[in-house]
Amino acid sequence: MKITKTDGPPKDVLYFDEEYKDDELDLSPQDVEDVAEIFKTPLTGSYNWDYTVADNRIKKLYELGKELNWNGSIDLDWDYNHPKDEPLTGIEGVTLPHEELDAWKNLTDEEKIEFDRHETAEVLSQFLHGEQGALLVASQIVSCAPTFNAKMYAASQTFDEARHVEVFNRYLQEKVGFHYPINPNLKAVLDKILTDERWDLKFIGMQIIIEGLALAAFTNMKLSANDTLLKTLLHYVIRDEARHVTFGINYLEDFVQTLSPEEIEERAQFAYEACVISRDRLINTKAMSKYLKMTDEEVRDFQLSNGAMDQFRSFLFSRVMPNLKKIGLLTDSVRPKYEALGILEYEHAPSDFEIDWAEITKPLESSDQVKAESDEMLSEILKAQEAANS
């Protein structure tokens, strides 16, 4: 075993050699090098000595987590290989803003497919890095959450996050062949959450902000995925994430009521700052910069100036704002700040507090069922957009 310690994450795209995709390749510990970046956190743990199991929604969510566990190695069809001459993502009849640029039109068909793979890989890589962050935070919450129910659920979530890291990593290595480094803004928000000493701020940052945004981003990619394996993988991950977000809202709604007004304001400000960083995180620049011959700053300006990014950002924060309101963190002091970001209007969207038990307890769907459900959802969204634009 070789462990190399670094002062920060890698900055270059990591390519995986074809030989390492051979299932029969037997790697010894001496053949593997782990690259580790050290972070320090003043974590304060707690025992719970009464082992009280409250008969409530959190207990039910914990039981569901055990019942609905899935195995990333056998429940996904890893034998499926998407045709290399077809894009991994894209919606028929929908033109993306960058496809109007001369730089994209001048690409050959092969280059357009290659660009699609790199752009998809850049987004999926952020999913992978974010899930590792969620894995680390969930493991911290096991130690420092004060109640027995919260510790038990965080333990089950830790295993969920490990499974998500596993499947995203495997897809990128085996089906794409490379992954991108972490977006600096995503790294900033993960650092902010992981190194804070207060367990409930970790909880707010991860369960409400990061997981809420991830749930929306995963859904967006699932709807546009052409790769059957990728679409099904995302669907299974979304099922888990929906439970995680619901757990966070149900637990925090009660907990926030135990805090003083000053403590609530402090946490409301923390959530706002996490949203600001996460809003910038949505802009990935590397693939577009490489293939469309733009600087990172030009890509950022282009992304911020087109309506598609505003629409995508709205979709993301429509999952976060109502949840912040539900747990009591849309205070009078931060509301104008969210208004300035242009996302306060989503406070009235449906929150994830109410649980559709019939939906959340369904057995794992087949790939065909996932595709049919995804196509139906996409059709409804496109019809709504068409009606809004008419």
Q: Where are the regions a protein language model picked out?
A:
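Terminal targeting/low-complexity segments that flank the catalytic cores of oxidoreductases
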Residues: 1-139, 143-151, 174-181, 185, ...
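A generic secondary-structure signal for well-formed alpha-helical elements
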Residues: 145, 162-165, 169-179, 229, ...
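Active-site-adjacent scaffolding segments
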Residues: 165-222
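Short alpha-helical scaffolding segments that buttress acidic/His motifs in well-ordered protein cores
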Residues: 123-124, 154, 204, 234
